[in-house]
C-alpha cells in the first residue's frame, strides 16, 4: 500500500530551496509517529536535504543514477522498483519530493496531509488533485503556540476507488 505524507500551505506549497519553508515541530512529531516502523520512499534531493537515514524506518531512495550509494538506505532507480517494494499490505510512505509525488500519485492509496493555513514563498508544490476522488477519514486541528506559530490541521484521506485511476 502506498501512502503519501506531506505538509502544504494554503497554495499547495511544500518546499523552498530543497527545504521546508516553515518550522512546525508538531508536524515533525506527527511525521515521526506515523512513519516509524515503516518503509519511507524519497527522491535523492529529499534525502540530501534530510542528510541521513531516518531511524526506525527502512529508507528507500529513488534516483536515476543507479551507481549512487546512500549509506543506510536501499537505492532504487525506477518507479517499478518502488511499486514492487510497496505491492504488499504493508504501508509504504512517500515523503517527497514534488516530482516523486507527481509520478506516484496514480498509485497512492492514502494521503496524510498537514494543511497549514498560511501562505509561504517557495518553489515546490504538491500536485493538484480532485478531492472528490478521496474520502476524508480523519481530521485533527493542530495546536498553535509559540513553537508552532501557524494554524494547521492533520488530515487523512483514502482513495474512494482503488482502481488506480489516478485521482488527479
Swiss-Prot record:
GO biological process, one term: tetrahydrofolate biosynthetic process
GO molecular function: dihydrofolate reductase activity; NADP binding
EC number of this enzyme: 1.5.1.3
Enzyme class: oxidoreductase
DHFR domain span: 1-159
Keyword NADP carried by entry: yes
Reactions listed under catalytic activity: (6S)-5,6,7,8-tetrahydrofolate + NADP(+) = 7,8-dihydrofolate + NADPH + H(+)
Entry-linked Pfam families: DHFR_1
Superkingdom assignment: Bacteria
Binding-site residues, substrate: 5-7, 27, 57, 114
UniProt keyword annotation of Cell membrane present: no
Keywords: NADP, One-carbon metabolism, Oxidoreductase
GO cellular component labels: cytosol
Annotated residues for binding of NADP(+): 6-7, 14-19, 43-46, 62-65, 95-100
Effect noted on mutating residue 165 to V: In strain: MI112
Recorded family membership: Belongs to the dihydrofolate reductase family.
Function: Key enzyme in folate metabolism. Catalyzes an essential reaction for de novo glycine and purine synthesis, and for DNA precursor synthesis.
Protein name: Dihydrofolate reductase
Source organism of the structure: Bacillus subtilis (strain 168)
Amino acid at each position: 500500500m502506498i501512502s503519501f505524507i506531506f505538509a502544504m500551505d494554503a497554495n499547495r506549497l511544500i518546499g523552498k530551496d530543497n527545504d521546508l519553508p516553515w518550522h512546525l515541530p508538531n508536524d515533525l512529531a506527527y511525521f515521526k509517529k506515523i512513519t516509524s516502523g515503516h518503509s519511507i520512499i524519497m527522491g535523492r534531493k529529499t534525502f540530501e536535504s534530510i542528510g541521513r537515514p531516518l531511524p526506525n524506518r527502512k529508507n528507500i531512495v529513488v534516483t536515476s543514477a543507479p551507481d549512487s550509494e546512500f549509506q543506510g538506505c536501499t537505492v532504487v532507480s525506477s518507479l517499478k522498483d518502488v511499486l514492487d517494494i510497496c505491492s504488499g499490505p504493508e504501508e509504504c510512505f512517500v515523503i517527497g519530493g514534488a516530482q516523486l509525488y507527481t509520478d506516484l500519485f496514480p498509485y497512492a492509496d492514502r494521503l496524510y496531509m498537514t494543511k497549514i493555513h498560511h501562505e509561504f514563498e517557495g518553489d515546490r508544490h504538491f500536485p493538484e488533485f480532485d478531492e472528490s476522488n478521496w474520502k476524508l477519514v480523519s481530521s485533527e486541528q493542530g495546536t498553535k503556540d509559540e513553537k508552532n506559530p501557524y494554524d494547521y490541521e492533520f488530515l487523512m484521506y483514502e482513495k474512494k476507488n482503488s482502481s488506480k485511476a489516478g485521482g488527479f
